[in-house]
Regions:
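NTP-dependent small-molecule kinase module
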Residues: 29, 162-170, 184-218
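Hydrophobic anchor at the beta1->P-loop junction of P-loop NTPases
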Residues: 38
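P-loop (Walker A) phosphate-binding loop of NTP-binding proteins
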Residues: 41
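ATP-binding Walker
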Residues: 44
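Walker A/P-loop
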Residues: 47
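ATP-dependent small-molecule kinase phosphotransfer cores
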Residues: 67-127, 134-137
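Conserved phosphate-donor/acceptor-positioning beta-strand/loop module used by diverse small-molecule
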Residues: 128-132, 143-165
Length: 218
């Protein structure tokens, strides 16, 4: 009887440990598959809001995009972008290494590498993608159950134009191209889970923070 009880006790412990292991795996898988997508027309405040989220949620990690443009003086390869030659970028397209990619401005290519998202998941963090509108729609379609998408928009196209001018990096044709693209992208806002109108940056940051906090608790 004592032997039988000991065997039963050992079996119960083993069963409990096995159940706990599978529950842990399930929880890890659910967290691993989560992905946050922040998108907006250029000049809407997307970068500032993304930085705020990363500063306030340690479980988030910025997904570094790949790009074929030349780095600016303050940018570092592997930190701000993965700077690739156009040949390397196209090789990765052919090898199906991108989660999404697009030719954005002036023939320059940008994209999200699958390996980058996997790197973040392997660290048991949630990737935050700061990407173009078309790419955001594509990624959301690949993760319909486990993604959170936030579309940031300016109060108006005129305000967006004013913000772009204040940067001092756009003028003439390039400015008009960005404004035209932004007006087009605004028509896609209904594709995303949440829309934040960035009239006041601090309020927009708080709204994004509340949305992300709820998503991470699911």
């Amino acid at each position: 009887m004592l032997v039988r009880n000991l065997c039963r006790s050992a079996w119960d412990v083993a069963t409990f440990q096995l159940e706990a292991f599978f529950i842990s795996l399930q929880a890890m898988s659910e967290q691993e598959n989560k992905i946050i997508i922040i998108t907006a027309p250029s000049g809407s405040g997307k970068t500032s809001i993304t930085k705020h989220l990363l500063d306030n949620f340690p479980q988030l990690a910025f997904s570094i995009s790949a790009a074929t443009r030349k780095p600016r003086s303050y940018e570092q390869d592997g930190k701000d972008y993965y700077f690739l030659s156009e040949k390397d970028f196209h090789d990765k397209i052919r090898n199906n290494e991108f989660l999404e990619w697009e030719m954005v401005y002036d023939g320059k290519y940008y994209g999200t590498l699958k390996s980058e998202v996997r790197r973040i998941w392997d660290n048991q963090q949630v990737p935050v993608l700061d990407i173009d509108v078309k790419g955001a729609i594509h990624v959301q379609g690949q993760y319909p159950q486990s993604s959170l998408s936030i579309f940031i928009e300016p109060p108006s196209v005129d305000e967006l134009k004013r913000r772009l001018l204040s940067r001092g990096t756009e003028s003439g044709d390039s400015l008009q191209a960005r404004v035209n693209k932004a007006a087009y992208e605004l028509s896609f806002e209904h594709h995303f889970h949440h829309v934040i109108v960035n009239q006041d940056l601090n309020k927009a940051k708080q709204e994004a923070e509340e949305i992300v906090r709820k998503f991470l608790k699911q």
